[in-house]
């Protein structure tokens, strides 16, 4: 899980979602997991 100021899609499979007021990226590739913080 990467914590970043700006979360971006890294590939076509990445999805930008909101959970508990946090912007997150979920993907089939676990390296692409990010959350805003």
Curated annotation (Swiss-Prot):
Keyword Chaperone part of the UniProt annotation: no
Gene Ontology annotations for the cellular component aspect, listed alphabetically: cytoplasm; ribonucleoprotein complex; ribosome
Keyword set, alphabetical order: Ribonucleoprotein, Ribosomal protein
Gene Ontology annotations of biological process type: translation
Protein encoded by which gene: rpmJ
Record has Ribonucleoprotein as a keyword: yes
Protein name per Swiss-Prot or TrEMBL: Large ribosomal subunit protein bL36
Family statement drawn from the similarity comment of this UniProt entry: Belongs to the bacterial ribosomal protein bL36 family.
GO molecular function: structural constituent of ribosome
